[in-house]
Amino acid sequence: MTPAARTQAAIELLDAIILAAREGGAAADTLIARYFAQRRYAGSKDRRAVRDLVYAAIRALGEVPASGRAALLALATDDAALAATFDGSSHGPAPIAA
């Protein structure tokens, strides 16, 4: 996975976690395990990087954010490397609007 694809995967996971939090659904650990069980192509380093991004967003925000993208954009304000992954590439998230 490219860094941008890892960011997109974290956004997708955060969206699922946010929905589950609002509806009293499964825990984040369970959702992460299910997500990667369906995506066997992701290697251990990819899974670790995505998981770390997801938990960093959860720890940093406290409150339930509007979306996974909003959560990672909040992290990207302090992390230039993360902000650079919002490049609009084929498997990455849409670019950050100025």
How should these model regions be labeled?
Residues 1-98:
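Class I Rossmann-like S-adenosyl-L-methionine
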